[in-house]
């Protein structure tokens, strides 16, 4: 009688508990161990020589390098190449209008001449004279481009200049246009692409250069065990005006260097990003693996 009553109970409850138990077991079995994920930077993992023989130590070193390269390859594959920004220097027509307004006329075709259609004006700086400070007219110019349409042969702007620029301009007005691809707006490429146009000539402007060096060359042979040879990428070259400026400070520095070269130095070619490198070296307690995040340059800019 009791056996029949037991069989008469619904079986959904025990089956559900059994499925939950299997699910929990699968989660525990698939949970990664502490050594499966590589955290950068990985700080000084000390290994006693008595605990690991050279083969095991070399194996761990190779495993660390493999995971590091896998992370880097995954990052590179997910990043899409961004078209390089471009700079245009134009000579607009500027004259004084009524009520102290400045009337600016710019040839529409000269804005993006020689560039793909995807390029748009990112920044516009007007210099009324060679010694005057730049006047940012980005928004008025972008508004004129939008309102006057793509078929207008010339863009006409009516501007109210700041008080210190409210003078009759000379014929040497310049308009500096910074253009970027619409597909890459808001992103700055960390890599130096070979199609960058250097005004000083090929290979003279800020770029990435790789140099092969041994531990003896670096003076590290007494404490670094591996690798015995390094491919060191570094930033070399000059920084002409408006070339690969890292930020607004670099733009101002380049501008002031042109006006006061004795007081303000030119921007320098420095790394914009780095590639992590793992070194195996000796420590007081044995041998250590350490990741260096600022040893090998990956991209360059002027700052």
Swiss-Prot record:
Alphabetized UniProt keyword annotations: Cleavage on pair of basic residues, Cytokine, Disulfide bond, Glycoprotein, Hormone, Secreted, Signal
Compartments where found: Secreted
Pfam (any one): TGF_beta
Gene Ontology molecular function: cytokine activity; growth factor activity; hormone activity; protein homodimerization activity
SUPFAM superfamilies for the chain: Cystine-knot cytokines (SSF57501)
GO cellular component, one term: cytoplasm
Disulfide partners: 198-205, 206-269, 235-300, 239-302
Signal sequence, start to end: 1-30
Designated name of the protein: Growth/differentiation factor 15
Gene: Gdf15
